[in-house]
């Protein structure tokens, strides 16, 4: 334990030793010594101030309002014994224990201390102090933030965050005490890892530009080719297909020009094929099995508009009946030799004469 060695000149803050982290601070704390070494007035009375917990020790800083010869009181963990948390029925909770004097600490012997937490927090402080003491004994101290004294006051350097987050601390300003003038080596300017951003976080690589505000202007390649005329992959619409109705875009790639096997509609869907002659008025197109009459036949007489079903066209060798003769009876042969022409009956006769045989 040391007396008057870890406080600022104005007694607003504790002077944290180099390499230690501030874990917790409690204000409105009373410190008293029920049992103190004889012959010393430093331990008399009750002192009011603030209590600081670091990685290796507990520091009490007396309030400026108290006219007390003890400005600060430091208790390292390895010199504290028999620490307990007391919870009286009437009064605030407090921590009680025994402290041994440190070499060159400003006093000798041992004393019993009592720390009363007027605004609460004794149990939390005692639990955190026990964890910090155990971690320090194992060589892995708790670290949250490191403090060092500079020309303008106390500065905070962020350290390893093992368990507890730092609280909002007040910065004390004033001239540093003797021995704490210049900042220690390693706690001045933050290390290179906390300075300027690394090279990978500098300017964006070549080819990356800032996006246009609101995407008003389309990027290259998305101009009229996409929203205007069809892209090069789409060919013109085949003949016979009009403009698509609104809402239909250009046809897909696979529906471009028709394949070679699908030509334009043949002429059989338009005008009649060349092999069909002109049919008389009032009659439709002849069935597909009827072909054009031979060369010797003219226009059928009146009343015979079309060739009856089932009949076939006569050969070219057969000739038309002589002039003046009527069309043959439906059951008679279509054409006879001229010498047998006289034997044909008239159309009004019901008798049929058979031709004479020629011997």
Curated annotation (Swiss-Prot):
Asked whether the keyword Nucleotide-binding is assigned, the reply is no
Query: Which InterPro entries does the UniProt entry name for this protein?
Result: GRAM, WBP2-like
- Residue spans with biased composition (Polar residues)? 334-359
Q: In which tissues is it expressed?
A: Expressed in testis.
List cellular component terms (GO): perinuclear theca; sperm flagellum; sperm head
Motif (PPxY motif 5) on chain: 273-276
| Pro residues: bias regions | 252-262
Stretch list, region 6 X 7 AA tandem repeat of Y-G-X-P-P-X-G: 173-303
Q: Where does motif PPxY motif 1 map?
A: 219-222
- Residue ranges of the GRAM domain? 16-87
A GO molecular function annotation here is: WW domain binding
Region entry Disordered: which residue ranges? Answer: 252-359
Q: Where is this motif: PPxY motif 3?
A: 245-248
Place the motif PPxY motif 2 on the sequence: 231-234
Query: Superkingdom, according to UniProt?
Result: Eukaryota
Q: Does the entry feature the keyword Repeat, yes or no?
A: yes
**Which GO BP annotation is one of this protein's?**
male pronucleus assembly
Where the record places motif PPxY motif 4 is 259-262
- Name of the molecule in the record: Postacrosomal sheath WW domain-binding protein
